[in-house]
Amino acid sequence: MSWRGRSTYYWPRPRRYVQPPEVIGPMRPEQFSDEVEPATPEEGEPATQRQDPAAAQEGEDEGASAGQGPKPEADSQEQGHPQTGCECEDGPDGQEVDPPNPEEVKTPEEGEKQSQC
């Protein structure tokens, strides 16, 4: 008796043909510009000045936040994470640190204890 299982070899899938950008046509720089051109008003409509919405919002925020007092700074972020004395997973800048190379690690002396997380 011989075992006839499913083959692990799969035929390569046919690739879909995609036209390269040269064949589609040249790119038009006006489609990719960062600045948006303002729409020209029609003859019957008067031209209105458009303000940047972010600039208008800043003016409103200044008046509202003036009477509220100062906001807490980075100290409040540290209070959310109490120190446990074991900071193996995070480095000083909050990013993960790779474990040290075992060849470079010094073995602790008999009288010293090594903290373990």
Swiss-Prot record:
<feature type="region of interest" description="Disordered">
    <location>
        <begin position="1"/>
        <end position="117"/>
    </location>
</feature>
<feature type="compositionally biased region" description="Basic and acidic residues">
    <location>
        <begin position="103"/>
        <end position="117"/>
    </location>
</feature>
<comment type="similarity">
    <text>Belongs to the GAGE family.</text>
</comment>
<protein>
    <recommendedName>
        <fullName>G antigen 6</fullName>
    </recommendedName>
</protein>
<feature type="compositionally biased region" description="Acidic residues">
    <location>
        <begin position="32"/>
        <end position="45"/>
    </location>
</feature>
<feature type="compositionally biased region" description="Acidic residues">
    <location>
        <begin position="87"/>
        <end position="96"/>
    </location>
</feature>
<dbReference type="Pfam" id="PF05831">
    <property type="entry name" value="GAGE"/>
</dbReference>
<dbReference type="InterPro" id="IPR031320">
    <property type="entry name" value="GAGE"/>
</dbReference>
<dbReference type="InterPro" id="IPR008625">
    <property type="entry name" value="GAGE_fam"/>
</dbReference>
